[in-house]
Regions:
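ABC ATPase NBD coupling module
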Residues: 18-21, 72-89, 119-120
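Conserved ABC transporter NBD signature motif
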Residues: 63-71
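A short, flexible loop at the N-terminus of ABC-type nucleotide-binding domains that lies
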Residues: 1-4, 13-26
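The feature captures the beta-strand-to-loop junction immediately N-terminal to the Walker
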Residues: 40-42
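Helix-to-loop junction immediately C-terminal to a conserved catalytic motif
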Residues: 55
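Short coil-to-helix "N-cap" segments within the ABC nucleotide-binding domain's helical subdomain
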Residues: 76-79, 105, 114-127
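Short coil-to-helix segment of the ABC ATPase nucleotide-binding domain corresponding to the Q-loop/switch region
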Residues: 101-110
Length: 127
C-alpha cells in the first residue's frame, strides 16, 4: 500500500540578512495510512517546522514530499489551500476561538469554506 506521507532528504533553511538557520537537515519519514506517529524533542529541534511543511503551511528548501502519492512541493497556493481544507486536520496546542461566535459557529467555520456543502448539512455535522 502506498504511504500517506513520504518525505525524503527534506531540508528547511531560514534566512535573515546575517543568519542562516538550518531547521531541518536531511529528514526522511514515511507514515502509512492509519498509522499513529508521535514527535518529541527539545525546543527548537524542528518539530513545528516539519509539521508546518507536512500540513502545507510552509515549503521545504529542498527534498521530496509526497502526500497520498502526489508530489506537493510545486502546488499552487489555491491547490494547497484546497488540500488543507479537505484532506488535512489541525489540532493546535493553543487554540483561539473567535469571541463573537458561538462554539458551534466556531466549529462550523472551516466547513463554510468547503465548496458544495449546504448550510443545513454543515449545521447537522456540527451538532
Amino acid at each position: 500500500m502506498q504511504p500517506l506521507i513520504e518525505i525524503e532528504a527534506m531540508t528547511k533553511v531560514f534566512y535573515t540578512e546575517e543568519i542562516e538557520t538550518h531547521a531541518l537537515a536531511g529528514v526522511h519519514l514515511t507514515i502509512g495510512r492509519g498509522e499513529y506517529v508521535a514527535m518529541s524533542g527539545p525546543s527548537g529541534c524542528g518539530k513545528s517546522t516539519l509539521l508546518s511543511i507536512i500540513g502545507l503551511l510552509d515549503t521545504p528548501t529542498a527534498g521530496k514530499y509526497e502526500l497520498n502519492g502526489r508530489p506537493v512541493e510545486n502546488l499552487k497556493f489555491a491547490e494547497r489551500s484546497r488540500i488543507r481544507n479537505q484532506e488535512i486536520g489541525f489540532i493546535f496546542q493553543s487554540f483561539n476561538l473567535i469571541g463573537d461566535l458561538t462554539v458551534a459557529e466556531n466549529v462550523e467555520l472551516p466547513l463554510t469554506y468547503r465548496s458544495g456543502m449546504a448550510s443545513s448539512y454543515r449545521k447537522s455535522r456540527v451538532q
